[in-house]
Amino acid sequence: MAQYRREMLESEMKKLITQGFSQLKDPRLKDKFIDINMVRLSKDKSYLDVYVSSLDEDIDTIINILNNAKGMFRTLIAKNIKMFKVPEVRFHKDEGIEASIRINKLIEKIEKNEEGK
């Protein structure tokens, strides 16, 4: 039952954070495509880890901007979800997409080498 509740909370928090992106006033985020790939709430519900990716090259800048605005996201969660303790929001760069691209390139390279034999 606890796992189901945590998954429901993660889903709802992901929606709220996505809505929060439109409330950010930072001009550096204008016209940036930001995608939330995964949201993980810690077992004690004190941390919410948000894994973000972007098609833009400056993902590290985007992560820094989001981490600087994490208080706004925490307030948004507190206003919309009733919880005893509102989790601290932490944004991370999602390495999964980059890793899959590297793996695909390696596979293509191996296939080309095998065809050349």
Curated annotation (Swiss-Prot):
SUPFAM superfamilies: Ribosome-binding factor A, RbfA
GO molecular function terms listed in the Swiss-Prot or TrEMBL record: ribosomal small subunit binding
The keyword Cytoplasm is annotated on this UniProt entry: yes
PROSITE patterns in UniProt: RBFA
GO cellular component annotations of the record: cytosol
Compartment(s): Cytoplasm
GO biological process, one term: maturation of SSU-rRNA
Keywords: Cytoplasm, Ribosome biogenesis
Assembly information from the UniProt record: Monomer. Binds 30S ribosomal subunits, but not 50S ribosomal subunits or 70S ribosomes.
Family (UniProt): Belongs to the RbfA family.
Described function: One of several proteins that assist in the late maturation steps of the functional core of the 30S ribosomal subunit. Associates with free 30S ribosomal subunits (but not with 30S subunits that are part of 70S ribosomes or polysomes). Required for efficient processing of 16S rRNA. May interact with the 5'-terminal helix region of 16S rRNA.
Name this protein carries in UniProt: Ribosome-binding factor A
Source organism per UniProt: Petrotoga mobilis (strain DSM 10674 / SJ95)
